[in-house]
């Protein structure tokens, strides 16, 4: 099984280049002001400009305005948007632009209802629930809650590490795994050794 790897919360072009050299399939930048991994517009553009053809660039947003989304599409031109907030299907679909929809795994969540009507060409990313944080929790959820039978690309996030990613893949069989804090030396600072080790553990 050829599982892909997304390194999210990249904060410098150098980190993006290091991650790609290590074998990352996707590079994520966070355009959400409340995140410790948030980058400004120009820096996001600089990071995305380093992304090679064949590697996806992903712009993560949380409850952004319509005008901001159009600005991201026009000026950053990411491969995918990633909606990680409380955005409705109507909101996400209106841009007619490829996107990933993040689903935060609240305890009482019904997954089939949560994904309904989203035209998420990039798939659905399942992340841990936190009532204050939109992603980046560093906490894993119960992977057994995810559907075994599915007709969409499943991206697994939430508390992944170099140590647990093999178990995660064996349990969930995801299309892609997504990591941020699990390969950092401090918030927003990716550790090249951990990035390389994580990718080796996924693809090795």
Q: Residue locations for each model-derived region?
A:
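Conserved N-terminal beta1-alpha1 strand-loop-helix module at the mouth
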Residues: 1-204
